[in-house]
């Protein structure tokens, strides 16, 4: 099993237990990011998401009001919601990309130019669809670490989460 940690905060943010998909159904961005499909699960009800996932026609309306319904990846990795304005995001992402580029220049210089090209397209997509996104950070609440990008695709009841690959460290267990 692989676990993905944030490069700067060291927070666990995802694992390979979730299929990695092309971000926003755009294969051109797969060199810089991956997307995972989440499910809503009833915490403490131990249905393991079966009753609430899209494929099984899950119906949230039949949830016991005393049971908390959570997004599986957000809950498992203790991701914290981070409200951002477009201006805040623009300021953050410029600094974060500079930080990642500096790290890449030190550790993997041949990756710098492809990263810059792809991440530019990624950021353009986020800014063009900004109101459709929710943002998360790892459990340490390190606001200088990487963001997790959440958005809802079509009529899905659970968000898709998108991660920038170069901001993650892969660990095998």
Swiss-Prot record:
Protein localization: Cytoplasm
GO MF annotations, alphabetized: calcium ion binding
InterPro entries in alphabetical order: Mss4-like_sf, Mss4/transl-control_tumour, TCTP, Translation_control_tumour_CS, Translational_control_tumour_p
Gene3D superfamilies for this protein: Metal Binding Protein, Guanine Nucleotide Exchange Factor, Chain A
Domain TCTP: residue ranges: 1-173
Record's GO cellular component terms: cytoplasm
UniProt xrefs under Pfam families: TCTP
Main localization category: cytoplasm
Domain of life, per lineage: Eukaryota
Stated family: Belongs to the TCTP family.
Main function: Involved in calcium binding and microtubule stabilization.
Name recorded for this polypeptide: Translationally-controlled tumor protein homolog
Source organism per UniProt: Theileria annulata
Gene (UniProt): TCTP
């Amino acid at each position: 099993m692989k676990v993905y940690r944030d490069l700067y905060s060291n927070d666990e943010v995802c694992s390979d237990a979730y299929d990695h998909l092309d971000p926003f159904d755009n294969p051109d961005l797969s060199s810089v990011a991956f997307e995972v499909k989440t499910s809503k699960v009833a915490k403490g009800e131990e249905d393991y998401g079966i009753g609430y996932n899209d494929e099984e026609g899950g119906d949230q309306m039949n949830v016991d009001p005393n049971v908390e319904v959570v997004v599986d990846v957000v809950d498992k990795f203790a991701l914290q919601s981070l409200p951002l304005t477009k201006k805040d995001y623009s300021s953050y992402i410029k600094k974060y990309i500079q930080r990642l580029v500096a790290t890449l220049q030190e550790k993997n210089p041949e990756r710098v130019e492809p990263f810059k090209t792809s991440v530019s397209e990624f950021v353009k997509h986020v800014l063009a669809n900004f109101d459709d996104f929710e943002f998360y950070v790892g459990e340490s609440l390190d606001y200088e670490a990487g963001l997790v990008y959440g958005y809802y695709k079509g009529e899905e009841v659970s968000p898709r989460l998108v991660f920038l690959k170069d901001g993650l460290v892969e660990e095998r267990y």
